[in-house]
């Protein structure tokens, strides 16, 4: 991934390890997520789009859409990214996304074990964005 072809970051959440109940009650994902210390973490910038992908759930898929809210920080020896990700009223499920042929190549399908953050390309974002409810994320 490069800044030129980045459509949005994806933060994945496994509800077997990170409970969803408090996030659902609050209507948004938690505000900080652990990410891998690699070249991707150095590409993250405030204002970039970020999607919230829930794994290991009968309705796995995109549960929220928002923005990176600040610079990556070190907390407890690990990198964290600050975000604001309002949850969608209903998730856009993996099954729904797979009906769009070109979205089958999304990294979350090709490499589901990839550490946070995953990403979608600008081309994938163009196909994905109309499937999301109005989120105010259209502009870069």
Identify the role of each PLM range:
Residues 1-46, 120-140:
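Compositionally biased, charged N-terminal/linker segments
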Residues 54-59:
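Short, charged beta-turn/beta-strand-edge "cap" motif at the junction between a beta-strand
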Residues 61-125:
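Aromatic- and Lys/Arg-enriched surface recognition patch
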Residues 46-48, 64:
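Short beta-strand or tight-loop elements
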């Amino acid at each position: 991934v490069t800044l030129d072809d980045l459509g949005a970051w994806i933060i994945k959440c496994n509800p077997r390890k990170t409970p969803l109940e408090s996030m659902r009650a609050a209507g948004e994902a938690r505000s900080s997520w652990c990410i891998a210390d690699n070249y991707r973490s150095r590409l993250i910038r405030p204002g970039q789009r970020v999607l919230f992908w829930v794994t290991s759930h009968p309705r796995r898929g995109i549960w929220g859409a928002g923005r990176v809210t600040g610079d990556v920080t070190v907390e407890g020896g690990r990198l964290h990214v600050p975000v604001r990700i309002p949850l969608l009223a209903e998730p856009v499920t993996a099954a729904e996304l797979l009906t769009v042929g070109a979205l089958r190549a999304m990294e979350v399908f090709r490499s589901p074990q990839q550490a946070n953050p995953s990403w979608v390309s600008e081309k994938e974002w163009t196909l994905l964005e109309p499937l999301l409810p109005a989120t105010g994320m259209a502009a870069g």
